């Protein structure tokens, strides 16, 4: 394959035995050994943390690290056997690689990409990406949200109430129309074809998202194929509002 945006290091297969204290997961490897892995996703992981699920772990070569293993992938069976990426450190890395390759034509022309730019009324927030460089287009403020919860083939965000996410929507909306504001939902599994706000978990977020769209917020629900080999971009899911 030549279209991988990201290639995983060698991974270790196991079975999820327990997830606890947000950061820890006990996993039985195929060798029979039980290890405690770092869980980089501290959210509820609704629908994707079923005990007994197949998982994939990476292993750090750093001897000083307290937990050598990191939980990277969990296999779900909502539609067909599908790997779901659960390492929340990866989406922003992968989006940055995709931006450098200009894989999102919806964003138009830009030549400058900067990460973690301070913005907001109180200047206490950071947007994931700031894009500029075109003389004819407004600068772009782009926020990335990792998305793993689904109902059938409909991806949903958020999977729990998120006051932080609500704040991000308000701040992106406040930039309009002088700037372009873009919310990119990183659908971290390949079995979804549509996207909608998770109204049942956070109706305020859904309301704010719809209001923001009406005022000019752009939404990119981006589908990614996730396997133990790596991650690649599949295009946009249909936005269901």
Swiss-Prot record:
InterPro entries: SfsA, SfsA_C, SfsA_N
GO molecular function, one term: DNA binding
Coiled coil: none
Gene3D superfamilies, alphabetized: 2.40.50.580, 3.40.1350.60
Listed NCBIfam families: sfsA
Family: Belongs to the SfsA family.
Protein name stated in the entry: Sugar fermentation stimulation protein homolog
């Amino acid at each position: 394959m030549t279209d991988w945006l990201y290639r995983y290091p060698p991974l270790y297969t196991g079975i999820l035995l327990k997830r606890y204290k947000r950061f820890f997961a006990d996993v039985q490897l195929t060798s029979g050994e039980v290890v405690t892995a770092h869980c980089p996703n501290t959210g509820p992981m609704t629908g994707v943390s079923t005990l007994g699920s197949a998982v994939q772990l990476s292993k750090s070569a750093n001897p000083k690290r307290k937990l050598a293993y990191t939980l990277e992938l969990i296999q779900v069976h909502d539609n067909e056997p599908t790997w779901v990426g659960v390492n929340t450190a990866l989406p922003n890395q992968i989006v940055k690689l995709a931006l450098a390759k200009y894989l999102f034509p919806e964003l138009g022309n830009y030549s400058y990409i900067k990460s973690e730019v301070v913005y907001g009324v109180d200047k206490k927030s950071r947007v994931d990406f700031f894009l500029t460089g075109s003389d004819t287009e407004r600068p772009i403020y782009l926020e990335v949200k990792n998305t793993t919860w689904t109902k059938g083939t409909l991806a949903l965000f958020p999977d729990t109430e998120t006051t932080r996410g609500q704040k991000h929507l308000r701040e992106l909306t406040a930039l309009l129309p002088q700037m372009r504001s873009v919310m990119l939902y990183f659908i971290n599994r390949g079995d979804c074809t549509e996207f909608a706000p998770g109204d049942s978990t956070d109706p305020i977020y859904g309301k704010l998202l719809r209001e923001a769209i009406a005022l000019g917020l752009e939404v990119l629900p981006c589908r990614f194929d996730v396997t133990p080999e790596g991650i690649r971009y599949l295009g946009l899911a249909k936005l269901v509002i």
